[in-house]
């Protein structure tokens, strides 16, 4: 089986350096870059154990993601027929959708009786010298902003390669890392050397899990964030097995959302005792949806919430205390559970709108 290592977002400014660095350790590399003329959309180059193949694919009006993923998949199929097994690095330029690549590969493999390839790692490479500017670029007209692709790539990746990390000040580098954490707190960071080599081999990178439910969120690309450098962002986890009062949690959101970069988890509300609510927030927007209904008479669930907070503005102890105040008190737990469903729920409309829209 071919093990595929996908790298997203490499700009042409340091693509050549990164490619040369990878060639020192990898035998097969396929990379794409935007063509410099109007005849084709993408140029590609395949390094296959010393043999070099070059060409151009697509047309000016084609979708970059569609063209590159189809060509990459067919190329990998040819390599599998040639070698049977091995590793290949596939490098996609900026403005290629990371989820579109993985979805296409998985769908194509599902249609086969025998799998021939597996996505082993997914990473994003970024330029530290321009990252804080790129991440705030807004869209022009109907075109997607570069920042949107950065959000999607960083969140979808398990690791990020930092190019030009030694060409900015230590304070600026910490700012880059802090903003990366605000977008994806679980991503692992690795420095690219000046010659494009990594400090570890690709086989040592975090393994890609296509089924991970936190791998992608539309909120990430729909929300425009302002990088908070020096905000001392911190990842915290809150748990409880007591149902929550919906009105008090709504108040918590009103009072704290501006200091929470991202939150994800499952919540258990007293007025929806036979469901958990899937919760997510990013920047200043949130999304929630009812999960599967339990049929059992006796029900017990857990509130589980992962938050990335601006600890310079509000400590984790205060956030924990605010969340604990959303829980049912002992006297409320002793009340008639049949009345809980009638509790005021300012967030109910958000769930209904999501369900009615079919999202």
What are these language model-derived features?
Residues 1, 257, 271, 297-302:
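A structural signal for short secondary-structure junctions
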Residues 100-107, 156, 175-179, 322:
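Alpha-helical scaffold elements adjacent to nucleotide-binding pockets in ATP/GTP-utilizing enzyme cores
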Residues 21-25, 45-48, 106, 177-181, ...:
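Short, solvent-exposed amphipathic alpha-helical segments in soluble enzyme
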Residues 298-359:
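Generic C-terminus detector
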Residues 13-16, 38, 270-277, 313-319:
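Short, surface-exposed beta-strand/loop "edge" segments at domain boundaries and coil↔beta transitions
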Residues 5, 90, 160-161, 234-239, ...:
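Short cationic amphipathic helices and targeting signals
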């Amino acid at each position: 089986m071919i093990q595929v290592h996908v790298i997203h977002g490499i700009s042409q400014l340091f693509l050549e350096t990164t490619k040369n660095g990878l060639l020192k350790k990898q035998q097969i590399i396929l990379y794409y870059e935007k063509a410099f003329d109007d005849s084709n959309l993408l140029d590609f180059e395949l390094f296959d154990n010393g043999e070099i193949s070059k060409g151009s694919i697509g047309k000016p009006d084609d979708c970059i993601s569609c063209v590159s993923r189809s060509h990459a998949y067919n190329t990998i199929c040819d390599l599998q027929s040639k070698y049977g097994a091995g590793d290949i690095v596939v490098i996609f330029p900026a403005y290629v959708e990371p989820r579109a690549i993985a979805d296409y590969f998985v769908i194509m493999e599902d249609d086969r009786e025998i799998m021939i390839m597996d996505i082993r790692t997914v990473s994003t490479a970024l330029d530290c010298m321009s990252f804080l500017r790129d991440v705030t670029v807004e869209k022009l007209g109907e075109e997607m902003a570069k920042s949107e692709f950065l959000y999607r790539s960083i969140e979808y990746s398990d690791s990020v390669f930092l190019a030009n990390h030694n060409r900015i000040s230590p304070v600026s580098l910490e700012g880059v890392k802090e903003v990366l954490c605000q977008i994806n707190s679980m991503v692992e960071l690795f420095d690219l050397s000046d010659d494009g080599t990594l400090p570890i081999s690709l086989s040592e990178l975090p393994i890609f899990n296509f089924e991970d439910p936190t791998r992608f969120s539309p909120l990430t690309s729909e929300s425009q964030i302002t990088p908070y450098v020096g905000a001392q962002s911190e990842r915290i986890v809150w748990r409880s097995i007591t149902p929550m009062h919906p009105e008090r949690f709504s108040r918590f959101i009103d009072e704290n959302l501006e200091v929470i970069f991202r939150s994800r988890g499952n919540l258990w509300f007293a007025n929806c005792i036979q469901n958990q609510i899937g919760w997510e927030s990013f920047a200043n927007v949130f999304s929630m949806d009812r999960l599967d209904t339990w049929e059992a008479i006796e029900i017990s669930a857990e509130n589980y919430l992962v938050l990335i907070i601006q600890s310079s503005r509000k400590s984790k102890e205060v956030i924990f205390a605010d969340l604990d105040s959303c829980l049912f008190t002992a006297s409320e737990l002793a009340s008639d559970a049949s009345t809980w469903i009638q509790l005021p729920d300012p967030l109910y409309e958000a769930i209904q709108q999501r369900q009615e829209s079919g999202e």
